[in-house]
């Protein structure tokens, strides 16, 4: 399925390109450079003082003195203070680059952005309609904000246990059902792209949400590079989304934990802007990392001016997919995306590999490649591996293919196949019924019970298999036998991890007390 570029909504500036000279600027990073070049006697935080002396010697040996010199505190003249500060100019350039009305830099990752979004839309009303495969950080935000959720289920690839997206028709039906149930949505939250690169019809979803009187929030964490090359999907902010969470560090080149939040141009932005600003202020650190913010400034510059390099990444990823198609041991998951009406495009920088023909678990294969070959894939399922190619990068994908082939042909793989044949892996479970609000369940009187006794009880925790971090269970949901089996299988798999679990093996569940 080829990526498509729908037309941006009226009044939105076209994508920034290398021809836009302003996008070559990095005002905030340059301001840090100027500050670091000054002769200084720092008698303030941070305690390392910008050098490798005293207690900081080991730190300077570890990362070098340059990061210490650039690690300046907040509220500095000629850096982040004032209406026309270097920071404010960098934020304006980012908004322009992604087609937003306004952009915020985040140093708590897209997880902070999701919590901000939940807090902000609470100012519009208590009811939110959320894609059930939303990231666990949005579930955390729903709980914190006291939102009342209802859900729209994504399409599911049952062969691979993969959740994709939501079509405009499915969203329309879900919004109508919520309204008929007396819980008309005050906001809508969807995910695009998915963890496997499936891109939803954001423009169509925005039209549906707006027709029902609700803003559209898009968790675009996995698509920070969208809009910066003709062969990439468009930025959601240009397609009518009211708020877009963007995890710039994932594929956009900034440092880990840095992200952005974009306010779009939809009919709700005037109401949302002050709410978002207030939510940012109560979720952000009062000691924001200058290094993380500078990395966002530079990543924006690199994306906006780097179409040629991004094109090379796309060519490399396409060649990797072609090689996998020619290898009978593997397949490409996105080749089957045409069967799902919610998918209108594919992220070409994400290569989802079908390993079912090889007869090995994706979890085993991912761990084997990391341990033996130093090749690290983003995530795995029982039948797949997902590779990410950072925008502008051209890793040695031929070597990765050779290592994949060698791993599945190894004696260890044969031993693993016999175990897989004997035991298999549980299917992705359907969510249990929501029996009480997440907030009420979280703050209820709770107890820990063995996994076998948890079936039929109400969860007090959010439990999410990582990666990708989609909650398999949220506070207030009934715990099903299928969910217990799935989470325990994930916890027991190579590199398996369940966020929010009471113990590493998911042997106990925290539930609300009976009576």
Residue ranges and their predicted role:
Residues 308-386, 391, 412-432:
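Conserved small-domain helix->loop->beta segment predominantly found in fold-type I
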Residues 1-66, 464, 468-471, 500-502, ...:
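N-terminal glycine-rich, Lys/His-bearing helix-loop that initiates the first secondary-structure elements
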Residues 18, 28-31, 37, 82, ...:
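Conserved PLP-enzyme active-site core in the AAT-like
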Residues 102-104, 246, 374-378, 497-498:
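A short linear hydrophobic-aromatic micro-motif
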Residues 194, 302-303, 357, 391-395:
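A generic structural motif
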Residues 62-112:
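Conserved N-terminal alpha-helix of the aminotransferase class I/II PLP-enzyme fold
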Residues 273-277, 294-303, 344-349, 379-385, ...:
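Short acidic (Asp/Glu) and glycine-rich catalytic loops that position anionic groups and cofactors
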Residues 368, 372, 379-515:
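PLP-dependent enzyme catalytic core of the Aspartate aminotransferase-like
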């Amino acid at each position: 399925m080829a990526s498509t570029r729908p037309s941006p909504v009226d009044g939105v500036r076209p994508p920034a390109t290398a021809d836009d000279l302003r996008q070559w600027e990095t005002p905030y990073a340059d301001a840090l450079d100027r500050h670091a070049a000054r002769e200084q006697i720092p008698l303030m935080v941070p305690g390392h003082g910008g050098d490798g002396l005293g207690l900081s010697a080991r730190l300077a040996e570890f990362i070098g003195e340059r990061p210490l010199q650039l690690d300046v505190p907040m509220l500095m003249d000629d850096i982040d203070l004032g209406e026309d500060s270097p920071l404010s100019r960098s934020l304006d350039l980012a908004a322009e680059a992604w087609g937003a009305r306004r952009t915020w830099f985040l140093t708590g990752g897209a997880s902070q952005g999701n919590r901000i979004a939940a807090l902000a839309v609470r100012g519009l009303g208590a009811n939110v309609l959320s894609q059930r495969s939303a990231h666990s950080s949005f579930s955390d935000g729903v709980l914190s904000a006291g939102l009342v959720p209802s859900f729209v289920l994504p399409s599911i690839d049952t062969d691979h246990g993969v959740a994709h997206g939501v079509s405009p028709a499915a969203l329309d039906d879900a919004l109508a059902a919520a309204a008929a149930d007396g819980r008309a949505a005050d906001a809508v939250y969807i995910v695009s792209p998915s963890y496997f690169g499936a891109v939803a019809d954001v423009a169509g979803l925005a039209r549906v949400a707006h027709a029902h009187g609700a803003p559209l929030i898009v968790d675009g964490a996995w698509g920070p590079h969208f809009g910066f090359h003709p062969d990439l999907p468009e930025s959601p902010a240009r397609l009518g989304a009211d708020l877009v969470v963007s995890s710039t560090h994932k594929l956009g080149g900034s440092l880990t934990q840095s992200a952005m939040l974009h306010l779009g141009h939809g009919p709700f932005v005037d109401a949302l802007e002050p709410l978002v600003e207030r939510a940012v202020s109560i979720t952000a650190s009062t000691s924001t990392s200058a290094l993380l913010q500078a990395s966002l400034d530079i990543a924006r510059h690199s994306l906006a001016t780097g179409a040629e390099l991004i094109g090379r990444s796309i060519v490399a990823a396409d060649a990797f997919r072609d090689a996998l198609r020619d290898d009978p041991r593997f397949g490409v998951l996105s080749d089957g995306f045409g069967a799902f009406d919610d998918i209108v495009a594919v992220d070409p920088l994400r290569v989802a590999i079908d390993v079912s023909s090889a007869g090995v678990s994706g979890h085993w294969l991912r761990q084997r490649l990391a341990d033996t070959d130093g090749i690290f894939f983003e995530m795995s399922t029982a039948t797949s591996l997902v590779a990410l190619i950072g925008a502008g990068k051209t890793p040695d994908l031929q070597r990765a293919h050779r290592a994949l082939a060698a791993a599945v042909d190894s004696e260890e793989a044969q031993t693993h196949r016999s175990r897989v044949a004997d035991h298999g892996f549980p299917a992705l479970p359907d969510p249990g019924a929501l029996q009480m609000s997440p907030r009420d369940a979280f703050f209820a009187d709770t107890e820990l019970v063995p996994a076998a006794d948890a079936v039929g009880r109400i969860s007090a925790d959010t439990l999410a298999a990582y990666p990708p971090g989609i909650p398999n269970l949220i506070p207030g949901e009934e715990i099903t036998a299928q969910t217990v089996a799935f989470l325990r299988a994930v916890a027991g798999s190579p590199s398996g991890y369940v966020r929010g679990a009471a113990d590493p093996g998911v042997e106990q569940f925290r539930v609300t007390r009976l009576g």
